Amino acid sequence: MNSFKTINLLLILSFLGLAACNSSSDDTDTASETEVETEIDTGTDTDPDTDTPLTTGILHSAYYEFDSENVEVVLSGDNVIIETNGLPNHTSPYWSSDHELFVEPTVTSYEQMAPGNIDDFVGTYTLTVANSPEKASSSSATGLGAIGIAVSGSVIYNDEEGPGIALDNAVGSLDYNGAHTGPQSFHYHLEPISFSEDDSNLVGVISDGFFLYGRKCNSTGDYPTDLDESGGHTSTTQFTQDADYHYHIQNELYLNAYYILFPGDYQGTASAIN
């Protein structure tokens, strides 16, 4: 009888031991998952010992604002590779009339519109920039063609319509997002109100790696007063706890009605958008 009780007691103790092990294992698994989630940081944290930006393995969280259907963003070491199909994620009269995002022209007309449709373009644009870009020793002029990639998927142009030709005479062809087609693709010249209208929203990234925001500064909720000649300054944003350099659409009227996206020079070292 005593032998039977002893066996039962041993079985109970063994069961309790296994339960304790399983509980410990569950706690360990949960802790491991928490650590993994914590390590996948989308911010721009710094090393607490050195205040050095952690560029390797941590993608700047602003890139998560880009439309994932049109834009692919890949962190490669200290660089970011951005590839887009060049198509916007919003409506426009420049889509083919049978496209689901087509709308009738409002601020332009069929007579004024540039030739071609958005969906005529078949290809990609690729830009490689530093994940933590730095200002160059001197500024450099933008050129014709794409100078940045917008969060919508389309590309950003400067304030010229051709070599030394101001945008003035082409404004009538722009849709309500300040964009039109030609010579190869749909692109923005003016404030794109579908995703930034008199606010601090992210507009895109310029080809020197610095982000372009709307006319207002997120850190103050108002128009920044300390912008340089390129519309840039250093402050915190909705994506950073530490201040960093970035551009804004300048709150200066163009032709008494519009706001040019990026009329200034690059303040960093620009890469080609191919």
Where are these regions (language model features)?
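Bacterial N-terminal signal peptides that target proteins for export
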Residues: 1-9
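C-terminal motif of bacterial Sec signal peptides marking the signal peptidase cleavage site
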Residues: 17-20
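Bacterial signal peptide processing site
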Residues: 22-25
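Solvent-exposed N-terminal domain segments of exported/luminal and surface proteins
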Residues: 33, 37-43, 47-165
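Extracellular/lumenal glycan-associated surfaces
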Residues: 125-129, 150-154, 182-195, 240-255
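Short helix-loop boundary/capping segments
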Residues: 165-177, 181-223
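Short, low-complexity cationic-aromatic patches
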Residues: 172-184, 228-243
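Long, compositionally biased interface segments
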Residues: 230-274
